[in-house]
């Protein structure tokens, strides 16, 4: 499965009500480090059926970024049962992102 674009209208259903852990990637198109993380996140989404992967564009969804206290991007957040269980800022290699799960 590919990563899902998360916004205010689908956040509750896709993230909070998910029966799988959710990896959220807070990003923006102008962010260089974000562009390095996007292909890794997409690859994880395709490889792992046991998790859901969502991308949140902070320019289009500032309220979600604020809700998670995102101060710099990329920020990766892992949610389970509607709760944050892991969070990391900055570009990371695939192994470090997988270790968050």
Where does each model-flagged region fall?
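Conserved redox-active cysteine motifs that mediate thiol-disulfide chemistry
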Residues: 26-40
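A short beta-strand-turn-helix
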Residues: 3-22, 62
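Structural micro-motif
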Residues: 22, 68-77, 92-95
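Residue-level signature of catalytic and energy-coupling elements of molecular machines
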Residues: 11, 24, 41, 57, ...
């Amino acid at each position: 499965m590919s990563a899902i674009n998360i916004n205010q209208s689908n956040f509750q259903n896709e993230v909070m009500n998910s029966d799988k852990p959710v990896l959220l990637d807070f990003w923006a198109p102008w962010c260089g480090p974000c562009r390095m993380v996007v292909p890794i996140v997409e690859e994880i989404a395709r490889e792992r059926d046991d998790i859901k992967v969502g991308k949140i564009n902070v320019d289009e969804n500032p309220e979600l970024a604020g809700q998670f206290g995102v101060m710099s991007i990329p920020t990766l957040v892992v949610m389970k049962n509607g709760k944050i269980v892991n969070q990391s800022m900055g570009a990371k290699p695939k192994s470090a992102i997988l270790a968050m799960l």
